[in-house]
Regions:
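Bacterial N-terminal signal peptides
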Residues: 10-22
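Short hydrophobic/aromatic-rich beta-strand segments that constitute the beta-sheet cores
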Residues: 61, 88-91, 107-110, 163-165, ...
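Flexible, surface-exposed loop/linker segments and immediately adjacent secondary-structure boundaries
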Residues: 115-161
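An acidic-aromatic
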Residues: 79-130, 201
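N-terminal secretory signal peptides that target proteins for export/translocation
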Residues: 1-7
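N-terminal leader/targeting segments and the immediate start of mature chains
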Residues: 25-62, 66-72
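Gly/Pro-enriched, hydrophobic low-complexity segments
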Residues: 143-152, 156-211
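Amphipathic hydrophobic-ligand
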Residues: 72-78, 178, 199
Length: 211
């Protein structure tokens, strides 16, 4: 699998932008009002609800891609952004500059090193479209839609949880073997994606000032 293609490169930032949140302020108070849940096993409903309650509009990331086509991991750094109501952006800043933007049903890819700017429609990529719809469902708290597209497995408690997603439909399976999210409360720490051919990508989110 080549994570450099538009289709697959858009998947990871999409996951992060639609799910990366932080429980702060009112959301944190809401969690406390329901008692201390840190010692109780969490469910997918609780994870999705926590992620829905709060999010950051900008977060830095470091992404490592492991592929049979590479002699060593490819590591890139950049910023993920969300602009309401539904614009998602991944900007790679190091070691080269690239930009991916998902707006409604359009995906735009820009690369300085490749001297290219291209826009595609999600209508032409059923597998990616199903992923988009599933994660939008996650952000809006629609657990039923998420379960419709993925087999979901949650382990851990509110302090430290993992959410494993495996596509149900053939289109999704052709693109992703699984997605594994790990985090605490309403924050995602890492997202790992494994492709059917064994290639994988791991993104670590870094809170703090963005470039």
């Amino acid at each position: 699998m080549n994570f450099g293609t538009i289709r697959n490169s858009c998947l990871l930032p999409l996951c992060v932008l639609l799910l990366a949140g932080s429980v702060t302020g009112e959301a944190a108070e809401s969690s406390l009002s329901h008692g201390d849940r840190s010692s109780n096993a969490w469910t997918v409903e609780q994870v999705v609800a926590s992620l829905k309650e709060g999010r950051e509009t900008s977060v830095s990331f470091e992404e490592a891609t492991y592929s049979s086509l590479l002699t060593e991991p490819l590591i890139v750094r950049g910023v993920l952004r969300f602009t309401p109501p539904a614009t998602l952006e991944k900007e790679v800043l190091e070691p080269y500059r690239e930009r991916y933007v998902i707006e409604e049903d359009r995906v735009t890819f820009e690369s300085e090193r490749k001297h290219v700017k291209k826009t595609i429609s999600l209508e032409d990529y059923p597998a990616l479209r199903s992923v988009v719809e599933a994660f939008r469902a996650s952000f809006t708290g629609d657990v039923a839609q998420l379960k419709k597209v993925y087999e979901t497995t949650v382990e851990g408690t509110s302090r430290e949880w993992t959410l494993l997603l495996r596509p149900h439909d053939p289109a999704g399976k052709s693109m992703v073997d699984y997605l594994l999210l790990s985090g605490s409360e309403g924050r995602i720490a890492t997202i790992a994606i494994r492709a059917p051919d064994g290639d994988r990508s791991v993104m670590t989110l870094r809170r703090g000032p963005s470039k």
